[in-house]
């Protein structure tokens, strides 16, 4: 009775706020849903989210040490109740309760999306999957069974003990579920493709509350749809991933100051790598032009899964004062574990900030990369002049990552994914325009700056015949439609699969977060 009273109080307190924002169609349905859940799950499984939220620090060194959600925009939302799922049956009960009451819900895996409502429900039910975070290694079967509530840091720490790994994320604080359902760029993608292409089996809760194991052999249509189709078909509670041998890796960050000579050298080396990468599948690379603590700088991440220091394919990124015109400011490259490399990258994205990402894809071209760098600097300087100079935590970034032919070729395994890319499309540049700031009052300035960089870059690419319609789901903004970018044939396939497994459209209507079909 006490727990039910607490949940009722939370819903009543929330009702005026939710109604004013138009985010709840019927708050009474969610009050009913929360009371019903509290009577069927243990007291520990349903929490007073407002009380729990107040106990969380707003800003920390990273997601693990800070808030429930990585971005302020998600953390600010208030669900009617928070369900702490411990097993797939708990998730099934939430789905059934949502269906019977009409109360919307959201699923929090790692909580790393910056888009409000993607993994937190304002006025509805939020399912916290952290209790479904087990990592079980079956070396004899060549598979790692990973709960959907795990984060990649915990996954890699467990796998490091076995000298095995999986194709997964690159930051410790990113959740397993979101990354795998949206694609997943990895240090191992050159060898094995995107992370989603290395899922052997999904345990999923469907719209009717049933729990199924889905693989290429059991449900080939749903299996393919889940490889890039997002959260449109059910709630995945476990991912069974292909297991690979992995010893110590070489890798780290290389940082230069922003100079015309540095921009020229890095963009040229990046484009050359994009074309040459198929000759060495054991390496991976990304680059970014950023602004932090008053300075612009280029950062390049270089990685080798064999542990080779400075492999030849990275020769153009070595210190060369004549080419770069400046020495490196930072070099962290070393031979270490995959979990250590993931922790290093996680430190670059502290929790508790406001954040916005958007994305675009272009064909590999040096001149376009240099134009984009110019657009980025121009818009950041404009934002600084319009109040962001006062925000010492303002950290915009233009990120570029190669989708090489070998990565694209590996997508075809087990029937392929739904993203509409093939080897002949490459090499491509996947861009992430990701800006972080602290004050809500600066939202308009920041969003205008991001939009301008994106629009100018797209316009330049189209003029040069370098534009590609693909939008990578894991970097896409709320107002972008990555699924439409997969092409008409794949969209029709996804609609058919959705109708087969969710004919009433529960995951379209009652799970408003996520990119929809």
Curated annotation (Swiss-Prot):
Gene3D superfamilies: 3.30.465.10, 3.40.462.20, Uridine Diphospho-n-acetylenolpyruvylglucosamine Reductase, domain 2. InterPro entries: FAD-bd_PCMH, FAD-bd_PCMH-like_sf, FAD-bd_PCMH_sub1, FAD-bd_PCMH_sub2, FAD-linked_Oxidoreductase, Oxid_FAD_bind_N. The modification Pros-8alpha-FAD histidine is found at residue 112. Belongs to the oxygen-dependent FAD-linked oxidoreductase family. The gene is FUP4. Residues 1-19 form the signal peptide. Keywords: FAD, Flavoprotein, Glycoprotein, Oxidoreductase, Signal. The keyword DNA repair does not apply. It holds the Pfam family FAD_binding_4. Glycans are attached at residues 163, 208, 346. GO terms for molecular function: FAD binding; oxidoreductase activity. FAD-dependent monooxygenase; part of the gene cluster that mediates the biosynthesis of the mycotoxin fusaproliferin (FUP) that belongs to the class of bicyclic sesterterpenoids. The product of FUP1, preterpestacin I, might also serve as a substrate of FUP4 to yield oxo-preterpestacin I. SUPFAM superfamilies: FAD-binding/transporter-associated domain-like. Disulfide bonds: none annotated. Pathway: Secondary metabolite biosynthesis; terpenoid biosynthesis. Residues 75-246 form the FAD-binding PCMH-type domain. This is FAD-dependent monooxygenase FUP4. Its cofactor is FAD. The keyword Oxidoreductase applies. Disruption phenotype: Leads to complete loss of terpestacin and fusaproliferin production and accumulates oxo-preterpestacin I. Its EC number is 1.-.-.-. Fusaproliferin shows cytotoxicity against pancreatic cancer cell lines and provides a new chemical scaffold that can be further developed to obtain more potent synthetic agents against pancreatic cancer. Fusaproliferin and its analogs show also anti-inflammatory activity and can be hit compounds for the treatment of inflammation-associated diseases.
């Amino acid at each position: 009775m006490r727990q039910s009273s607490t949940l009722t109080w939370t819903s009543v307190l929330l009702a005026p706020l939710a109604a004013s924002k138009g985010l709840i169609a019927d708050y009474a349905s969610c009050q009913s849903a929360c009371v019903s859940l509290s009577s069927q799950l243990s007291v520990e499984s349903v929490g007073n989210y407002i009380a729990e939220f107040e106990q969380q620090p707003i800003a920390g060194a990273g997601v693990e040490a800070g808030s429930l959600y990585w971005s302020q925009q998600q953390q600010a939302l208030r669900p009617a109740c928070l369900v702490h799922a411990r097993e797939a049956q708990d998730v099934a009960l939430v789905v059934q309760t949502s269906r019977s009451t009409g109360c919307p819900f959201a699923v929090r895996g790692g909580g790393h999306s910056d888009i409000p409502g993607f993994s937190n429900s304002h006025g509805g039910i939020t399912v916290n999957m952290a209790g479904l975070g087990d990592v079980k290694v079956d070396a004899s079967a060549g598979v790692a069974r990973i709960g959907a509530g795990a984060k990649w840091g915990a996954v890699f720490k467990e796998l490091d003990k076995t000298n095995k790994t999986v194709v997964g994320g690159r930051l410790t604080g990113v959740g397993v579920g979101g990354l795998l359902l949206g694609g997943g760029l990895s240090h191992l993608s050159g060898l094995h493709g995107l992370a989603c292409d290395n899922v052997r089996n999904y345990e999923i809760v469907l719209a009717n509350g049933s729990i199924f194991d889905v693989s290429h052999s059991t449900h080939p249509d749903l299996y393919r749809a889940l490889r890039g189709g997002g959260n449109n078909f059910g709630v995945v509670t476990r991912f069974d991933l292909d297991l690979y041998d992995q010893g110590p890796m070489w890798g780290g960050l290389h940082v230069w100051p922003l100079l015309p000579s540095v921009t020229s050298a890095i963009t040229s080396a990046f484009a050359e790598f994009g074309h040459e990468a198929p000759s060495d599948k054991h390496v991976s690379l990304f680059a970014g032009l950023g602004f932090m603590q008053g300075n612009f700088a280029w950062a390049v991440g270089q990685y080798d899964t064999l542990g080779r220091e400075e492999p030849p394919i990275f020769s153009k990124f070595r210190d060369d004062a004549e080419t770069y015109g400046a020495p490196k400011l930072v070099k962290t490259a070393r031979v270490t574990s995959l979990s250590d490399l993931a922790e290093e990258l996680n430190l670059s994205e502290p929790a508790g900030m406001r954040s916005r990402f958007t994305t675009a894809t272009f064909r590999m071209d040096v001149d376009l990369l240099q134009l984009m760098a110019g657009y980025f600097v121009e818009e950041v300087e404009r934002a600084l002049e319009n109040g962001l100079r006062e925000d010492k935590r303002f950290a915009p970034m233009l990120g570029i990552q190669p989708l090489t032919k070998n990565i694209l070729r590996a997508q075809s395994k087990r029937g392929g994914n739904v993203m509409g890319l093939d080897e002949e499309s490459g090499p491509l540049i996947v861009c992430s325009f990701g800006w972080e700031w602290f004050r809500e009052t600066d939202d308009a300035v920041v969003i205008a700056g991001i939009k301008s960089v994106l629009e100018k870059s797209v316009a330049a690419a189209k003029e040069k015949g370098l534009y590609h319609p693909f939008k990578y789901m894991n970097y896409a903004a709320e107002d972008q439609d990555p699924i439409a970018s997969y092409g008409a044939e794949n969209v029709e396939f996804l609609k058919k699969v959705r109708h087969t497994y969710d004919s009433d459209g529960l995951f379209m209507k009652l799970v408003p977060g996520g990119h929809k079909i």
